[in-house]
Amino acid sequence: MFRGSITALVTPFRQDGSLDKKAFGALVEWQIAEGSSGLVPVGTTGESPTLTHDEHQEVIRLCVEAANKRVPVIAGAGSNSTREAISFAEHAEKVGADALLVVTPYYNKPNQRGLYEHFAAIARSTSLPIFIYNIPPRSVVDMLPETMARLAADFKNIVGVKDATAKLDRVSEQREACGPDFIQLSGEDATALGFNAHGGVGCISVTANVAPRLCAEFQAASLRGDGARAIELQDRLFPLHKALFLEPNPAGAKYALSRLGRLENVLRSPLVTVEASTAEKIDAAMKHAGLLN
C-alpha cells in the first residue's frame, strides 16, 4: 500500500496568502491521474510551520476528500510538542487519513529516550499506521536505528520511516535493526535510486509535485528491477532534483508548478520566491526533463 512515488504535496496559496482550495483539489486530481501512488499533505513541503491549526486540519481533510481512497493519504502530523502531535493524529484519523507522517521533534532537541517517549505516546493515541520522519538537517536530532527498532517492536502501528538523512548505509542499518517488513521510504529525491537498491520501497518526493508521471515511472522501474530504465529516468530527473533545492523548499517546487500553470507562485513569510537566477536553472531542468518546450 505504501510504496512507489508518494508526493509530498505543496500547499497552494492565493495572492492574498489564503489557502487556494481549488488549486489544491486540482493538484490532487492531477497527481492521481499521473500515477502517483500516495499523497502527503502538510509535511515540510506543505509549509506546515506557517499554517494555522485550522488550516493544517483543513488541508488534510481536503486531501482525504479529493483522493477519495484512490491512493493512500499519509497525513502530516508532526510537532515538537507531543500533545499537539497527538491532536493532529487524532484529527487525521477522524477525517479518514490512511496513515500519519510524524517528524522527529525539532528545535527542542530531545535525546533518544525523549524521541522514544514522543512516538510511543502518539502510537498509543491512534490506530493509524505511523511513519517516522527522520530529517536531521531540519530537526537537528537523528533517531538512531536502535531507537527505531524499539518503537517498531513495541508498537505494531509504527510501520516505517521516511528517511531524509541521505545516508544510504542507514537503509541497511535500519533493515537490519527493524526487519525487512519495516517500510523504508526515501525523503531525498536525488538518492532515491540508491535508497531502493539498499532495500527501500519508494520515495516521499518533492520532485513528484512537478513531474509526477516521470517520478512514478522511475519508482516503478526501480522496484521491478529494471535498472536500465530507472537510470534513464534518473538522468532525466536529476537536474530537476538539484534545481528544486537550490533555495529553501518548497520555493523551487512552487515556482516550477507556477510555470506549469498549476498554482500561483506564492509562499508564506519567512519563505520567499526564488531568485531570477534560480528560476532560469529550474526552467532549464524542466526542459531537460521534457516538462517545458
UniProtKB/Swiss-Prot annotation:
Pyruvate binds at residues 45, 204. It is found in: Cytoplasm. SMART domains: DHDPS. The active site is at residues 133, 162. It is an enzyme of class 4 (lyase). Catalyzes the condensation of (S)-aspartate-beta-semialdehyde [(S)-ASA] and pyruvate to 4-hydroxy-tetrahydrodipicolinate (HTPA). This is 4-hydroxy-tetrahydrodipicolinate synthase.
